[in-house]
Amino acid sequence: MKYFKLLVLALVAGSIFSCSTPQKKEEADQKVTKGMPLTPATKVGLSVGDEAVAFSLKNVDEQMIALNDLKDNKGAIVIFTCNHCPYAVAYEDRILAIDKKYKALGYPVIAINPNDPAEQPDDSFDKMKVRAKEKGFTFPYLFDEGQKVYPAYGATKTPHVFLLEKENEKYFVRYIGAIDDNYKSADDVKVTYLENALNALLENKEVTETTTKAVGCSIKTSKG
């Protein structure tokens, strides 16, 4: 009988302990985590509304061009593009036309080649110089050496547009995506996404379509 009573007491004590332990652990966890900042998941690239990442890259004229060095401008049209991609080539004349029209209004084009020439030799710096001369580029054509700028922006394609607005000497993202809705033919374009966003900014209006899907070639990154 004495043994039986001891067994019952042991079972009751174990039951109480098992019920109270999670609660005590939860209380302890709350004490540990209370007041501690949560660590968000690592963000990849920029979103609309973010402050743009500054950069300084070599232009095809061998001069360094920095975003923060631009003067008397209202913003900038940063376009990640390249030599070899058929999508990028299809848009070259349209990019030239956009630069001609909007540079005078305060929004110059800045083209950046994000590709690793070891993976795509046609996108080497020397071939960038040749292409810029052949096409008569009126805008800087910069080389993202070391591939540090394109991931900071979150570019994934060529071409990939990031429209920046300048406020108090800082740049903020107002549009991300495609130039328009038809890479094959400029004559068949129905929606000029980039120009619509530019016109809205110039009229001090909100950009209604702030993001679209960039259509183009994947950026060629180093496999080493």
Describe each model-derived feature in a short phrase.
Residues S15-S18:
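C-terminal motif of bacterial Sec signal peptides marking the signal peptidase cleavage site
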Residues N68-V89, L198:
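Short active-site neighborhood of thiol/selenol oxidoreductases, capturing the structured segment around
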